[in-house]
């Protein structure tokens, strides 16, 4: 068995996988649930946490203690308050509050319990996951007692799985991975030749997925209920319950043309029918966004749709018929089907975990994963804020300067220089920016770190500061700002929180029993 396992930590569902004795990726299931994917929903009690579908049983009695869609909060400085039943700013948080990393650690601990051998893992994240979200994922794993060997982008993991299949020769060439899950969307174009996966570019939206479709269905239900009864549903009290109800309807409409269900509300129970056509119309705005991002990915690659050999579907939301129809309209041919879209990402993470632990694999496992190789890219523009003279405005302005270009192969290292603008300048700003566009306006970039490099002496303007960025294969940045004249450095390594900070977070949850 593989000593390193693969984990798909999802918005709606999560999964854990490893290579079996023959080298095939095997998605593991819990002993108490008859399914291989685990709902990323948790119930938090005083001394007990329930992870998975059983957490939903607490919705009626204690809805404020049920947490879902945690993945969407990973980059935010928030905590979930069981007193308020919502995410609140970190500085507002009091007792009975949990960070996104803590909540995710509960899910990881549950998955870890599916096998006794988990100590190290490859964990998947969305391609467009921001720096803070990646670091929070590493924090969550550490609290769950898992050493992360590498973070891998979800569509890349799926491509890695496809590359390992015995019939891989049938899907070689330019492959588009269309990954639409419960909370996030990624579309990645890559070359797959002789089991080598070479990512070209990715686009996506970390706030676009099946959960957004559920909300549109809920809005439909509410409107129909009001039309029939004159009253709206009470969404302030039972929104999560209604959303679970909406998800059930969405699943049904993926295979049926209409679905009728009795809806409980303030005016009593009422039978509501929703057709597939109504559903598709309600999510049209989201479909247009998916189409736009798909076209952006193709355009950004420098290729045309007709040059792409295959489109692979990943993520449970790709089962919705209009998704395949939209892809076919853009690509000129239908996407490939036949692989379990819920398990492909976890399976790919297991294959990559096998690549990372080849020395511990048996002969059959080594033969099964064959010559699979992986080369990913930086999905953001990584830069720094610099001050310069603007001859038009006749004043100094601050703007963003790109250091590492988007789609640069990983691991990446780039060095550039910036210069002081004043005589006797005592310090320079050391900032790190991240953006999806090549923006110079600082208002349109995400500032992920800010500090100062103080100079040991005074010099005329034009003092050179060497800026070096290193971006690792997990998508985590390391930066150095060096004053060339004195060799004084300001170094930044955006890694998980300090051991002391993590210890404090862990101490608040270590007594909790996870079921």
Per-range role (PLM):
Residues 99-111:
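Amphipathic alpha-helical coiled-coil/leucine-zipper-like oligomerization segments
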Residues 1-76, 97, 115-515:
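Oxyanion-binding/catalytic loops of NTP- or PPi-dependent enzymes
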Residues 84-96, 271-272:
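Short, conserved non-catalytic motifs in the polymerase core
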């Amino acid at each position: 068995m593989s000593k390193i396992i693969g984990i798909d930590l999802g918005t709606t569902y999560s999964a854990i996988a490893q290579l079996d004795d023959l080298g095939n990726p095997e998605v593991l299931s819990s002993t108490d649930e008859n399914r291989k994917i685990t709902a990323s929903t948790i119930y938090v009690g005083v001394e007990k946490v329930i992870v998975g579908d059983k957490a939903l049983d607490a919705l009626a009695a204690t809805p404020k203690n049920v947490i879902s869609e945690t993945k969407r909060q990973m980059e935010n400085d928030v905590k979930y308050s069981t007193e308020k039943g919502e995410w609140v700013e970190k500085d507002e948080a009091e007792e009975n509050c949990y960070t996104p990393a803590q909540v995710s650690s509960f899910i990881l601990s549950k998955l870890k319990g599916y096998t006794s051998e988990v100590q190290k893992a490859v964990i998947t994240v969305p391609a467009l996951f921001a720096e803070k979200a990646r670091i929070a994922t590493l924090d969550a794993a550490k609290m769950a007692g898992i050493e992360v060997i590498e973070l891998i982008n979800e569509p890349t993991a799926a491509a890695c799985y496809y590359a390992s299949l015995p019939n891989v020769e049938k899907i070689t060439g330019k492959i588009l991975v269309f990954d639409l899950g419960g909370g996030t969307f990624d579309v990645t174009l890559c070359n797959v030749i002789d089991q080598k996966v070479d990512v070209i570019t990715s686009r996506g939206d970390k706030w676009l997925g099946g959960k957004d479709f559920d909300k549109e269905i809920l809005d439909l239900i509410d409107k129909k209920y009001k039309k029939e009864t004159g009253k709206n549903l009470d969404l302030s009290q039972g929104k999560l319950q209604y959303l679970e109800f909406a998800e059930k309807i969405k699943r049904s409409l993926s295979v049926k043309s209409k679905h009728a269900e009795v809806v409980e509300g303030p005016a009593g129970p009422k039978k509501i029918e929703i057709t597939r056509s109504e559903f598709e119309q309600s999510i049209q705005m989201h479909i247009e966004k998916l189409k736009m991002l798909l076209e952006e990915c193709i355009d950004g690659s420098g290729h045309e749709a007709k040059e792409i050999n295959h489109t692979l579907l990943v993520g449970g939301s790709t089962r919705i018929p209009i998704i395949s129809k939209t892809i076919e309209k853009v690509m000129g041919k239908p996407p490939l089907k036949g692989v379990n879209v819920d398990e492909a990402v976890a399976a790919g993470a297991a294959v990559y975990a096998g690549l990372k632990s080849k020395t511990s694999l048996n002969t059959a496992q080594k033969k099964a994963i064959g010559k699979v190789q992986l080369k990913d890219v930086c999905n953001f523009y990584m830069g720094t804020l610099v001050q310069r003279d603007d001859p038009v405005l006749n004043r100094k302005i601050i703007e963003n300067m790109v250091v590492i270009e988007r789609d640069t192969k990983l691991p990446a290292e780039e060095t550039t220089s910036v210069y002081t603008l004043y005589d006797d300048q005592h310090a320079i700003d050391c900032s790190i920016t991240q953006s999806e566009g090549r923006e110079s306006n600082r208002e349109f970039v995400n500032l992920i770190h800010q500090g100062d490099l103080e100079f040991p002496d005074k010099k005329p303007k034009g003092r050179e500061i060497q800026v070096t960025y290193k971006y690792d294969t997990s998508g985590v940045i390391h930066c150095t700002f060096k004053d060339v004249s004195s060799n004084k450095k300001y170094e930044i390594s955006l890694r998980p929180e300090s051991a002391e900070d993590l210890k404090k977070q862990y101490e608040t949850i270590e007594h909790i029993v996870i079921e």
